[in-house]
Amino acid sequence: MWGAGTGSARAQAPSPASAAELRIGFQKGTINLAILKLLGALERRLPGRKVVWVEFPAGPQILEALAVGSVDLGATGDAPPVFAQAAGKDLLYVGAEPPKPDSSAILVKPDAPLRSLADLKGRRVALQRGSSAHFLTVQAVARGGLAWADINPVYLAPADARAAFERGSVDAWAIWDPYYAAAEIDGQVRVLATSRGLSNNNTFYLASRSLAGDEATLQAFFAALAEADAHVQGQRQVAAKRFADFAGLGLATVLRVLERRQPAPVAPLTPALVAEQQNVADVFARLGLIPRPIRVADSVWQPRNHLTRKFA
């Protein structure tokens, strides 16, 4: 259920431009948003308003676009909003999905000599900087008894990271679904570790401050998103086929993604989730991977409308 928000962030009035269109940043791999786009459910709930879908390769790019006003709303993993807030970007957390700890992993070649996380020492690890894979790698390195300086991170977007991994330019690849599932289905990888026990792999929805002031639009968005998730859960084969065709993925890959994915209703950030996200920020700050410490609660949306707070 939508309950009272956590933190001190308060929304301002929406900008006049927000009444004309709603621009959503998404990754093709974000199933709920992809299905929402395919169903047209949001467009039906916002008659007379143009919904613009803008595709990005990963969460950091979505939040950069959000920060400069190119999109109004987007979904990312745990690390991108931490990096954005530390860089002074004015964004608000407006919702979160349940954890998906089995949906990201560190991959190696089947015949690689790496057998434990400690074996990452001195190795080149491909990952998207500032992404959930970045936090997974940080946690994995620590679990292996290593310092961050003990590995050689190679910062690449997902498609470039896969190419580097396949040609042997890197020793390991930290990645999330559906890229993870696609690599598994292709059979040319071995899982060194998943994020289970290392990171909950949370998904967050973030909005511009102006959109956060338009609670009716956010209410419509989350209602439509619930409709998309119900479609995924209630018509799994149909949804899988639609998503596979849309994303250019094999059906087996999408079904593998769905096996690891529980129902994903969006809810406000609870105090526990804010604390968990604060830990993500603190870990990055201690390692000097973000320019300054941050207080996550300062960027958590506080809806004014009691109907929005109770919205499910």
Task: Place the predicted regions along the sequence by residue.
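Solvent-exposed, polar/charged alpha-helical surfaces in well-ordered, non-transmembrane soluble domains
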Residues: 40, 44, 64, 68, ...
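N-terminal twin-arginine translocation
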Residues: 1-15
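Short, glycine-/small- and polar/acidic-enriched structural segments
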Residues: 11-144, 153-155, 171-175, 191, ...
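Periplasmic-binding protein-like
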Residues: 97-108, 184-211, 222-225, 260-264, ...
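Pocket-lining segment of extracytoplasmic ligand-binding domains
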Residues: 79, 150-154, 159-246
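Secondary-structure end/capping motifs
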Residues: 213-291
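Short polybasic/polar patches that bind polyanions
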Residues: 47, 85, 142, 185, ...
